[in-house]
Amino acid sequence: MAKHPVPKKKTSKARRDARRSHHALTPPILVPCPECKAMKPPHTVCPECGYYAGRKVLEV
């Protein structure tokens, strides 16, 4: 039976938590559409009304 490598020392809570410090999720950034006030990602066509930069660019 083959032996596999195991940790020589127990990982401390501080080292474990420091490694996980970059794992947090960021909430999506949403802005209100100037035409219909629906929340949408910035710099994108509004999925509700189809407007972008004050012009109708998508038929909804």
Swiss-Prot record:
Q: Which GO annotations describe the biological process of this protein?
A: translation
**Might you report a single GO cellular component term?**
large ribosomal subunit
One GO MF term on file is: structural constituent of ribosome
Span-the-membrane segments of this chain are none
Ranges of Basic residues compositional bias?
A: 1-23
Could you name the domain of life of the organism this protein comes from?
A: Bacteria
Q: Which Pfam families match?
A: Ribosomal_L32p
Cross-referenced InterPro entries: Ribosomal_bL32, Ribosomal_bL32_bact, Ribosomal_zn-bd
Query: Keyword DNA repair on this protein?
Result: no
Keywords carried by this UniProt record: Ribonucleoprotein, Ribosomal protein
Signal sequence, renumbered to the chain: none
Q: Which PANTHER family match?
A: 50S RIBOSOMAL PROTEIN L32, LARGE RIBOSOMAL SUBUNIT PROTEIN BL32
Question: How is the quaternary structure described?
Answer: Part of the 50S ribosomal subunit.
* Sequence similarity: Belongs to the bacterial ribosomal protein bL32 family.
Query: What is the protein name for this chain?
Result: Large ribosomal subunit protein bL32
**Annotated gene:** rpmF
